[in-house]
Amino acid sequence: MAKRHSHYQGSRRRHARGSNSKKAGRGNAKGIQGRKIKKKPTPTNSWHNSSIPLGEGDLDDVGADFNPGRAFISPKTIEDYYFGRDAKSRSMKMGGLRPGNRYDSSTDLQAGRAAFRKRPMQFVKAKEVYDPSHNMIQKLRAKNETKNSEEIVEREADVFEEPGKMTSDVEYINNEDSENEDDDSQNSPSTDHSLSSNESKVEDGDLFFVDEEAQQSPDLTKIKRVCIEEIARPREVAIEFDPILTIGKVELSVSEGNESKEISVDVPNKGNKTYHPFAGYISNVLHGMHTSDSDNDELDYEIETENNSEPLYESSASSEVDQGFNYVGQRHNSRADNNLLPSPSPQLTEDIKCLSINGTKTFEGNNDNLPSPASEELEFGFKEEDFVINTNDIVVSNIRMGGVDNSYYLRCYRLLGDYDFHWIDQDLLTDFVVDELGLPEDRLPAYLNFIKNSLIPKIEPAEPTYSDIPISDSSDEGDSYEGDSYEDDEDMASSVVHSDIEEGLDDLIAYTLKHDTERFKTFETKSLETKGKGKKKKLLIDDALALDTETLETLQSKFSKRIETKAKKRKAKEDFIDQENRNSNDMLKKYPYGLHIQNIKDEFESFLSRNNDRLTFPPLDPHGNKTVMKIAKHYNMKSSKIGKANHTSVVVEKIKKTKWSSPNYSLIDQLMRQRPVFMRIDIRRPREEQAAFERTKTIRGKFHVKEGEIVGQNAPEIGNENIGRRMLEKLGWKSGEGLGIQGNKGISEPIFAKIKKNRSGLRHSES
């Protein structure tokens, strides 16, 4: 670009050539006709000269003798004095151009000629304070005090019934008011003096009022009485009453009082003897042992007990118990008998009379060592709360035991979004089961134990086989044993395998060994051989099998049925997944291939009504992402891009303006009338979906003809159903005749047209 000369810069009037301006070219000192212009000199006492002070900073010397030229002050001078015309608003010169007396003496002309910013500023304290409202406030205050004193005097006059005194006080106060109007400074002392004088005139006896007539009692018959019945509040019990109290392995039957908050224990004591809950059971067992062994036993041993003063148990069959005790010695010695008989429990004494549920009352007697009732948790499936969830939704196939938490290898569509197995932590599983499925938290440990027990079976201890104990059938060895070993050998003899059980065992082993080779025989397997694709897919069968036609048709029908079943299952699975994805909040699953502009608006409307803060759209092309961002702007939302390349998507977030502002639907409707369909760029569409969205050209069928072929050679003859043939037959035409009148008929054979595709010409034929 060419450089411009200096005479083009600035305003045209200042740098123009040959103009009438003072700085223009030649003859700038001349006017229009070239004559010189004479300038008038400015006087020294001009009001516009800033070096001459304007009355030493004051406007009072307008008519002074030493400056007779200032008889008139122009408005521009006043403006220059107060505001300054040629100076900047915040300059130091403007700081000095302020009204006020800057010097005490106006005779110092040398100081007066100094610049305003160099003159010192002095502050003078005023001798008197000009406050016109102060006097007005004092007058109003005095008037208020006068009115208050008048009201006090009038009240005292009504009580003591002294009208003469009241009038004198009022007159005195009125006189004081007149004096206050003359002299405001003496108002308050005079008023205080009048009030003090009035108070001194009142006697002490008149200050009290004595009621000589007693107050009459009211008539109580006129007062209505209402009887309100007190409703007894029911006693609230924080726990449920259980008629059976479990302490360790002992169960006690308890009963609840009606009015008291105590629970009594029913102890069936008879004759002040110790009660044992298993006394009846033990007596029945011992009685059965006595009846079965009384015929064969010859040895009778007595029981040596340490305490023979009182029996250990008390029951209805006490005689049978004693009789059973005498026969126990046939099987065990005295030391074993002492271990067999249970000692009386120190916990079940007569001192257990009442149990308190308030937590304040303690047990009476020596019952401090009572164990608390064991609260055994029910297994999963024994409560109604367990049926809130469906255990088929969560399929657990493996578990990893950890020090703190476990990991589970499970499959759950609602949790993971697919039908594959994944490893998840125990915290994630518990949150999903409690929050999503609604299982109570107190049943969560039972559910986890149920999963663990279903995967890890309990190992039960094996039953003893006594294989290490020698067993002999001889009677000599049996006589040498003592009573206790004799009984043990007799019990072990029952476990010996009888000979009749072993019958046929050899035949079974021989049969198993005979068919052992066929049982473990392996067959070669391979996939079926097919030909064709899609619906034309057929089973390829080897001819060496020599199968008949009926068998081949059966195999083909079964194979086609198998393919159709697989296709139906696949289609049903895809339809189910699509139906689940349509109700999902994840737009990547909801729109697998693309979305319409109406879908975008519906998603924005749904997002506006939900409590979510973020909404992620599927990856679209750049124009689609730009359209989504424009719609988000019209909905008063914030939009941003995430991802790279084909995975660039738009994330929309709510802001404060979204809640308080309404969307601009007019601009949104304009965007909806533009591009309708937006396809995803991160997923390739299948052929079926691609054919549905793209327009395909209809291909017409092409007819191929051969060289020399007669056109319409194989065309059928026109039948009698044709209306044209019927008209000709009515006119006298017959099949094989030409058209026309007699003597002027046309040809009977039609002219044949042959197809010619090559460029060799007509080629005259010799025939």
Swiss-Prot record:
R3H domain location: 594-656
Keyword Repressor: no
UniProt feature, compositional bias: Acidic residues: 176-185, 474-492
Positions with biased composition (Polar residues): 42-52
Annotated segments matching region Disordered: 1-60, 176-200, 466-493
GO CC, alphabetical: 90S preribosome; cytoplasm; nucleolus; nucleus; preribosome, large subunit precursor; preribosome, small subunit precursor
Family matches, as Pfam families: G-patch
Subcellular location: Cytoplasm; Nucleus
Residues modified as Phosphoserine: S105, S217, S255, S334, S343, S345
Gene Ontology MF terms in the entry: enzyme activator activity; nucleic acid binding
PROSITE patterns tied to this protein: G_PATCH
Cell division is among the record's keywords: no
SUPFAM superfamilies listed in its UniProt record: R3H domain (SSF82708)
A Gene Ontology BP annotation from the UniProt entry: mRNA splicing, via spliceosome
CDD domains documented for this protein: R3H_G-patch
SMART domains, sorted: G_patch
Primary location group: cytoplasm
Domain G-patch, residue spans: 720-767
Bias (Basic residues) ranges: 1-17
Keyword terms, alphabetized: Cytoplasm, mRNA processing, mRNA splicing, Nucleus, Phosphoprotein
Note: Present with 1440 molecules/cell in log phase SD medium.
Function: May be involved in splicing since overexpression antagonizes the suppression of splicing defects by SPP382 mutants.
Similarity field: Belongs to the SQS1 family.
Protein name: Protein SQS1
